[in-house]
Amino acid sequence: MLDTTANDEVQALLDTFGAALERGDIDAATACFQDECYWRDLVTFTWNIHTSEGKEAIAGMLRSQLAATRPSGWKIAAGESAAEEGGVTTAWIEFETGVARGYGLVRLMGGKIWTLLTTMVELKGHEEHKGFNRPLGAKHGAGKHRPSWKEEREAEARELGYSRQPYVVIIGGGQGGIALGARLRQLGVPAIIIEKNERPGDSWRNRYKSLCLHDPVWYDHLPYIKFPENWPVFAPKDKIGDWLEMYTKVMELNYWAKTTCKSAKFDEKTKEWTVVVDRDGQEVTLKPKQLVLATGMSGKANVPTYPGMETFKGDQHHSSKHPGPDAYKGKKAVVIGSNNSAHDICAALWENDVDVTMVQRSSTHIVRSDTLMDVGLGGLYSEQAVQSGMTTEKADLIFASLPYRILHTFQIPLYDKMKEIDAEFYAGLEKAGFWLDWGVDGSGLFMKYLRRGSGYYIDVGASQLIIDGKIKLAHGNVKEIVADG
């Protein structure tokens, strides 16, 4: 019996799958999948972010979308090879549809598809102006009264939103809105980003003094311009703010700072939005076809209310308004909460000679930064990963390829290992009285983030202060705040 390579196995399956799709045979296409199977589609088939779980759901999606999608050319991606580990064969793939070029990741078990990720790389006829298609920039030849690049940009800034309407308005000018604006710019789509702060990057600059990123640099690249090789692994907030401001300029984004949205209404007849904004005191009406809300998941302060707050004689504020520790030197402070911001603020207060107490109202998941980087992220987001050929784009797609239904099964063993590596650390926290948890199923940080968006701390030093009793600890919900504290 002849041995078949992993490449042969994957390509044979793709040939069968692709042929079934091309002839519209949905039964034959779904027969290429395991009984337990998942197809995560990012735009290519569904024009949405959609996960189909099981053969029946996949068949339903194909009945709805296959005729319009017209997929073809399924093959292992150029320059890639399939790999087998633990009974699972994985391969990067590429394909086309009637209107787009696609890329994806397939996992086979027993010769059939277990998970399939399909993503849209580019629309045919609307390719980005980069690489061989990059703009020339200089206008060679001669012509009278030609505007310079600077004059063209100034004219665009004067006209867009006034004499000429944007196709897209993005509400929110943090990193998400900025990255989307950059993508649209490269596609030639007129867009305006509106942001309430005075400058790009202020959503970072305005946070508490000691804030640094808790994710590593390899996790944080923006499209087109990667952070330089000497960029710190965990960048401080003001450095990030400056980078975002630079990025909006060099990527030629139409960024309206000091602008707030007053109202937005969609007209079903004209299929356009009427968006009224206040631009630095001037009311402007925009008429985009598309409106995007990029206001962030953690930007709005969740401010609790307690009896007696109005009588308290000292300073009180939410972490989003925390000015830093300098004004509190030699005083006592209470920080209500036990997640990332609370730990960072407590540590900075202790460093500046403040007698600080953390009030822990419920259990918190804690993972040491070094261990998380090594065990949890090292294979995808690290210098070692880069040296092995991993890119941020591929790492992101690997994460995206795992449906939430099974993502926890990949995470639990990692956090079991972290728990074992840092057993002494966790014993110290428990001895100090800190309430720990590992998520509802022991799957740790990422699942807790996806499920709740909170409830965790990536330890960069504050936990040891709790273990040592330097940050005091109190438990339970706040009953009342008294005038004298």
Residue ranges and their predicted role:
Residues 90-102, 125, 129, 136, ...:
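Accessory recognition modules or surfaces
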Residues 1-35, 154-165:
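Short, low-complexity N-terminal intrinsically disordered segments enriched in polar/charged residues
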Residues 83-127:
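Exposed beta-sheet edge and beta->alpha loop/turn motif
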Residues 7, 19, 23-85:
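A solvent-exposed, acidic/Ser-Thr-rich amphipathic alpha-helical stretch
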Residues 166, 189, 194-196, 237-340, ...:
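Flavin (primarily FAD) cofactor-binding/catalytic cores of flavoenzymes
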Residues 119, 125-167, 173, 185-187, ...:
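Glycine-rich dinucleotide-binding loop and its adjacent helix/turn
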Residues 205-242, 363-432:
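Glycine-rich active-site loop/strand segments that organize a redox cofactor
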Residues 176, 198-199, 341, 364:
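Conserved Rossmann-like nucleotide-cofactor binding loop
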